[in-house]
């Protein structure tokens, strides 16, 4: 597609050592980008860029399917998922597939089906990617105008945005349908230690749903990460799906207003930077969610949260010492505070010791022992159930600590047990990737703004050292 400006004026050109390493239409002369700059060569070749994106989707889905089958092949039903380094099966189990009361896996066949379906899908996507990258039309504008676009066409860009929003909304509603009609989802709060159940009484009150967004991110507030019942989670997906679909329809039907046309940079690289910024935010939120939230990420599958493991240890030793005759209500610890129980700054009865910092933890194995003023002494003396003892002992010994220095009082194992919690893996990976995406957002936003302002000239090539070197070939 011919454009009105020279590509060289807008994009800094990296000089190839060997100008012959290129395919027609994708070489440095016609695109202004060398081979290693990847999809930048395809900025104005919508057909080839489609191929790159479809092939990328194929790689993603292939990883999902292959890793899914790998986890199924290695899965041992007798051990908890979090002891086996699994990250995909816990997601499937949370959706209610293959599990029963207490999070026990009763059928691995749904996991196998999931892996195979993803592999088959990846083959279709892979074929489409190769077809559009190598055989399909270089540009879509002439043959398929609906799928064609010009990056500067603000109306077309917001139409594409609208289509994406509708697809995201449909995705949110798929979870709602699963929870309501197709077998339900796993609820860690179900009585007696968790079970799969259909969610019947959705929370649709905007005050509750949007109240999460208005909460402080700190302490006992915890912003949206503090959500602790499935009715709110599924109701939130109803709201989110509706907003995405309505917003998508809005963006398809309307053109950007004048203030939006002025405020944004309208180029391919600008859209890339916006997308990277959004993905970065997703990564940081996912990091906090998997680290702190034991409702959307049930501890039966992902292992306990850090605060949960710490509170579980305090509970385990309270149970032990109470059996040995300790009066847990009045015993003093080495600091003069309560050894087993103390009061929070606001007067609730909480666990004593170093775990006091986690006093606002909520967990399904602990909540039955709370009364109106925090932990209830009479319940701690008479009502502790065997499943609560078993679960807390299990969680105490599976803290997601890795090699953190501050362990919240958890007695760590010096003989290096080979255990890293999936919460540790998922939280750290999403934080690191979220950070990298943020850096990419800054990088591409800076380049896009410079190009729009007209002062992106690239490096002065006249004195480039490589020009005086012998060519590689």
From Swiss-Prot:
<keyword id="KW-1133">Transmembrane helix</keyword>
<keyword id="KW-0464">Manganese</keyword>
<protein>
    <recommendedName>
        <fullName>Photosystem II CP43 reaction center protein</fullName>
    </recommendedName>
</protein>
<keyword id="KW-0602">Photosynthesis</keyword>
<keyword id="KW-0812">Transmembrane</keyword>
<comment type="function">
    <text>One of the components of the core complex of photosystem II (PSII). It binds chlorophyll and helps catalyze the primary light-induced photochemical processes of PSII. PSII is a light-driven water:plastoquinone oxidoreductase, using light energy to abstract electrons from H(2)O, generating O(2) and a proton gradient subsequently used for ATP formation.</text>
</comment>
<keyword id="KW-0934">Plastid</keyword>
<keyword id="KW-0007">Acetylation</keyword>
<dbReference type="GO" id="GO:0009523">
    <property type="term" value="C:photosystem II"/>
</dbReference>
<dbReference type="InterPro" id="IPR044900">
    <property type="entry name" value="PSII_PsbC_sf"/>
</dbReference>
<keyword id="KW-0793">Thylakoid</keyword>
<feature type="binding site">
    <location>
        <position position="367"/>
    </location>
    <ligand>
        <name>[CaMn4O5] cluster</name>
    </ligand>
</feature>
<feature type="transmembrane region" description="Helical">
    <location>
        <begin position="178"/>
        <end position="200"/>
    </location>
</feature>
<dbReference type="GO" id="GO:0045156">
    <property type="term" value="F:electron transporter, transferring electrons within the cyclic electron transport pathway of photosynthesis activity"/>
</dbReference>
<dbReference type="GO" id="GO:0009535">
    <property type="term" value="C:chloroplast thylakoid membrane"/>
</dbReference>
<keyword id="KW-0472">Membrane</keyword>
<comment type="similarity">
    <text>Belongs to the PsbB/PsbC family. PsbC subfamily.</text>
</comment>
<keyword id="KW-0597">Phosphoprotein</keyword>
<feature type="propeptide">
    <location>
        <begin position="1"/>
        <end position="14"/>
    </location>
</feature>
<feature type="modified residue" description="Phosphothreonine">
    <location>
        <position position="15"/>
    </location>
</feature>
<dbReference type="InterPro" id="IPR036001">
    <property type="entry name" value="PS_II_antenna-like_sf"/>
</dbReference>
<feature type="modified residue" description="N-acetylthreonine">
    <location>
        <position position="15"/>
    </location>
</feature>
<dbReference type="InterPro" id="IPR005869">
    <property type="entry name" value="PSII_PsbC"/>
</dbReference>
<dbReference type="Pfam" id="PF00421">
    <property type="entry name" value="PSII"/>
</dbReference>
<keyword id="KW-0479">Metal-binding</keyword>
<feature type="transmembrane region" description="Helical">
    <location>
        <begin position="255"/>
        <end position="275"/>
    </location>
</feature>
<feature type="transmembrane region" description="Helical">
    <location>
        <begin position="69"/>
        <end position="93"/>
    </location>
</feature>
<keyword id="KW-0604">Photosystem II</keyword>
<dbReference type="GO" id="GO:0016168">
    <property type="term" value="F:chlorophyll binding"/>
</dbReference>
<dbReference type="InterPro" id="IPR000932">
    <property type="entry name" value="PS_antenna-like"/>
</dbReference>
<dbReference type="GO" id="GO:0046872">
    <property type="term" value="F:metal ion binding"/>
</dbReference>
<feature type="transmembrane region" description="Helical">
    <location>
        <begin position="291"/>
        <end position="312"/>
    </location>
</feature>
<feature type="transmembrane region" description="Helical">
    <location>
        <begin position="134"/>
        <end position="155"/>
    </location>
</feature>
<keyword id="KW-0157">Chromophore</keyword>
<dbReference type="GO" id="GO:0009772">
    <property type="term" value="P:photosynthetic electron transport in photosystem II"/>
</dbReference>
<feature type="transmembrane region" description="Helical">
    <location>
        <begin position="447"/>
        <end position="471"/>
    </location>
</feature>
<comment type="subunit">
    <text>PSII is composed of 1 copy each of membrane proteins PsbA, PsbB, PsbC, PsbD, PsbE, PsbF, PsbH, PsbI, PsbJ, PsbK, PsbL, PsbM, PsbT, PsbX, PsbY, PsbZ, Psb30/Ycf12, at least 3 peripheral proteins of the oxygen-evolving complex and a large number of cofactors. It forms dimeric complexes.</text>
</comment>
<keyword id="KW-0148">Chlorophyll</keyword>
<keyword id="KW-0150">Chloroplast</keyword>
């Amino acid at each position: 597609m011919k454009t009105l400006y020279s590509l060289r004026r807008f994009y800094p050109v990296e000089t190839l050592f060997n100008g012959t390493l290129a395919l027609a239409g994708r070489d440095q002369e016609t695109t202004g980008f060398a081979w290693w700059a990847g999809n930048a060569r395809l900025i104005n070749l919508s057909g080839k860029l489609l191929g790159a994106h479809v092939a990328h989707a194929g790689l993603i889905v292939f990883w999902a399917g292959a890793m899914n089958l790998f986890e199924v092949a290695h899965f041992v039903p007798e051990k908890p998922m979090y002891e086996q380094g699994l990250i995909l099966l816990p997601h499937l189990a949370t959706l209610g597939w293959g599990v029963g009361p207490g999070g026990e896996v009763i059928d691995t066949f749904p996991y196998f089906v999931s892996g195979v379906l993803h592999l088959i899908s990846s083959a279709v996507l892979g074929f489409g990617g190769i077809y559009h990258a190598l055989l399909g039309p270089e540009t879509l504008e002439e043959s398929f105008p609906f799928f064609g676009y010009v990056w500067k066409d603000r109306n077309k860009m917001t139409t594409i945005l609208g289509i994406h929003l509708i697809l995201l909304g449909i995705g949110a509603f798929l979870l709602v349908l699963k929870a309501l009609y197709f077998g339900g989802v796993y609820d860690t709060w179900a009585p007696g230690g968790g079970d799969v159940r259909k969610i019947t009484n959705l929370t649709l009150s905007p005050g509750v749903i949007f109240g999460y967004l208005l909460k402080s991110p700190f302490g006992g507030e915890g912003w949206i990460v503090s959500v602790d019942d499935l009715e709110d989670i599924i109701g939130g997906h109803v709201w989110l799906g509706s907003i995405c679909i309505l917003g998508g329809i809005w963006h398809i039907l309307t053109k950007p207003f004048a203030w939006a046309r002025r405020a944004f940079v309208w180029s391919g690289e600008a859209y890339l930077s916006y997308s990277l910024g959004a993905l970065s935010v997703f990564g940081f939120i996912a990091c906090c969610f998997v680290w702190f939230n034991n409702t959307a990420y049930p501890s039966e599958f992902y292992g306990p949260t850090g605060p949960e493991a710490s509170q579980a240890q305090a509970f385990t030793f309270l149970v032990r010492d109470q059996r040995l005759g300790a009066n847990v209500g009045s015993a003093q610890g080495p600091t003069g505070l309560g050894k087993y129980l103390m009061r929070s700054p606001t007067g609730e009865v909480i666990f004593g010791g170093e775990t006091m910092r986690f006093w606002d933890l909520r967990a399904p194995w602990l909540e039955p022992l709370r009364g109106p003023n925090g932990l209830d002494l009479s319940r701690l003396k008479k009502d502790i159930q065997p499943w609560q003892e078993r679960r807390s002992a299990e969680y105490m010994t599976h803290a997601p600590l890795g090699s953190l220095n501050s362990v919240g009082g958890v007695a760590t194992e010096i003989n290096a047990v080979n255990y890293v919690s999936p919460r540790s893996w998922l939280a750290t990976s999403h934080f690191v990737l979220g950070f990298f995406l943020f850096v990419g957002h800054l990088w591409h936003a800076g380049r896009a703004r410079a190009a729009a302002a007209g002062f992106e000239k690239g490096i002065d090539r006249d004195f480039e050292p490589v020009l005086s070197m012998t060519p590689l070939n």
